[in-house]
Amino acid sequence: MKNIKQVFGVLTTLICLISCTDFLDLSPVNKLSPGDFFKSETDLELYTNSFYQKMLPGGLTVVNRDGMGDFTSKNSSPTFIAGAYSSVNEGKWNWSNIRNLNYFIAKASSSPVEETHKRHYIGVARLFRAKEYFDKVVTYGDVPWYSKPIDPNDEDQLMRPRDPRAMVMDSIMADLDYAVANLHDIKDESATTITKQVALGLKSRICLFEGTYRKYHPELGLEVI
C-alpha cells in the first residue's frame, strides 16, 4: 500500500509539471519579437521615431565638421594620419544605423499595414538611409552599399570591397526619389517629423553637392546632375 501511494505521488507530481509547461513558457514581457511587431501603422511609426534621435545632427555637428575643413584642418590633421584611426575607434565607419534601417525596410515591406501608410514609413527609412550614406560618401568617397540586412556571421558581406562612389550616389538618389514619391504631403504643424517637403529639401542639398563635385571633377567622366 505504501508503494502504491509513493507511485501515485510521483505520477501526480509529473502530471502537475507537464500541465504547467505552457504556463512556464512565457515570452519576456519587456521585449517584442518580430512576429509581434510591424503589424500596425503605430508599430511602423514607433520604430521610425527611433531614427530621429540617432541620426539627426546635434549641436556639435557643425563644429566637428569644421575641423575637417580649411579653417581648422591644421589642428585636426592628426585625425587623418594613417594608423591614427581605424574602423574600431572611428565613429563614422559604423554601420549600426544602416543595419537598423535595412532591417526596418525589410520587415515593413511585408507588413499587413495599408499600402499608402506603409510606403510612407518606408520612405522615412529610405530618406534616413540616404542621409547616412551621403555623410559616409562625403567623408570616405567609395563605401560598400548595403540595401538589405545581412547575417552578422557572413564574412564575405562584412568584409567585401567598397562600391564605387558613383554607384553609391545613384543609390542615394533612388532612395530620395522613393521618399519624395511616397512620403505624406501633409504639413506637420509641429515641424518635428519627416514629410515630402523635408525629402525635397534634402534632395536639393545633396544634388547641389554632387552636381558641383561632378562639374569640377571632369576626369571622372560622370554626368552632371
Functional labels for PLM-detected ranges:
Residues P149, R214-I225:
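Acidic, serine/threonine/proline-rich low-complexity intrinsically disordered regions
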Residues S33, D43-N49, M55-P57, K74-Y140, ...:
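Conserved, well-structured interaction surfaces
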Residues R126, L200-I206:
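TPR/Sel1-like alpha-solenoid repeat signature
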Residues V137-V138, P144, K187, F209-P218:
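Short coil/turn linking the two alpha-helices of tandem helical-hairpin repeats
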Residues M1-V29:
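Bacterial Sec-dependent N-terminal signal peptides
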Residues D142, Y146-K148, S190-G201:
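Aromatic-lined, polymer-binding surfaces characteristic
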Residues C20-V63:
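Membrane-proximal, proline-rich intrinsically disordered regions
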